[in-house]
């Protein structure tokens, strides 16, 4: 074998090894997450008990704001958990015993509120029909409710039934749209990134928890 051919094969083999590694490069965990880790673990234990996954809530906060406590979205969502003002006012009433005078800009309160809201949404996700509803799908539906409102999701699950697909399978429901294409694309991407990419990344970085979607 000539040295030129050997060199070409070596370059190709190195590319085949390195390319997948680059494609699956780890998520960069913001340094700011360390400032809030104790609070995340504290509220997850309070809201979920031993079955909670701090890594999941951390992943959601990462997606929402990148852990920036002064984050404000173009549409007006506020703080580390990105609550809209109307949602924040509703939560101040709904979770008054737990939150007191709720301020969405206060990261201590907002992290607690995010966990409470996730629990509230998850408890409202119910199976439709006779097919099983997995924990992964329940969480995906709850996350979609957090991001885009549970009303839209219920309409889309209804469209899924009308389309003779499984309204309890989050990936099948993704194919059906009741809202505009832009909001729908954002809404289906939201749980995918949190549950399939970010939660495993936080677990790999040492945060406690178990990935709900595998």
What residue spans do the PLM features occupy?
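Non-catalytic cell-wall polysaccharide-engagement segments
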Residues: 4, 21-38, 50, 89-116, ...
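Cell-wall polysaccharide-cleaving catalytic domain and substrate-binding groove, primarily
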Residues: 62-87, 149, 194
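N-terminal Sec-pathway targeting helices
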Residues: 1-9
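Soluble periplasmic/extracytoplasmic beta-strand elements of cell-envelope proteins
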Residues: 59, 82, 142-144
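Extracytoplasmic
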Residues: 52-56, 62, 75-78, 138-139
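Short, charged helix-capping/linker segments at alpha-helix termini
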Residues: 44-54
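Bacterial N-terminal signal peptides
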Residues: 8-17
């Amino acid at each position: 074998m000539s040295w030129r051919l050997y060199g070409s094969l070596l370059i190709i083999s190195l590319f085949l090894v390195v390319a997948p590694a680059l494609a699956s490069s780890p998520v960069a965990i913001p340094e700011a997450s360390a400032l809030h880790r104790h609070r995340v673990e504290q509220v997850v234990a309070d809201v979920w008990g031993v079955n909670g996954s701090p890594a999941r809530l951390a992943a959601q906060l990462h997606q929402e704001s990148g852990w920036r406590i002064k984050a404000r979205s173009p549409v007006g969502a506020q703080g580390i958990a990105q609550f809209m003002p109307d949602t924040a006012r509703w939560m101040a009433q709904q979770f008054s015993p737990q939150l007191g005078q709720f301020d969405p800009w206060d990261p201590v309160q907002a992290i607690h509120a995010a966990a409470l809201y996730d629990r509230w949404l998850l408890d409202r996700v119910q199976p439709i029909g006779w097919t099983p509803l997995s924990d992964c799908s329940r969480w995906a539906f709850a996350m979609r409710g957090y991001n885009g409102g549970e009303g839209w999701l219920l309409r889309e699950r209804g469209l899924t039934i009308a389309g003779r697909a499984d309204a309890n399978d989050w990936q099948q429901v993704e194919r059906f749209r009741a809202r505009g294409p832009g909001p729908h694309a954002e809404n289906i991407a939201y749980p995918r990134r949190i549950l399939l990419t970010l939660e495993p990344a936080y677990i790999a970085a040492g945060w406690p928890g178990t990935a709900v979607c595998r």
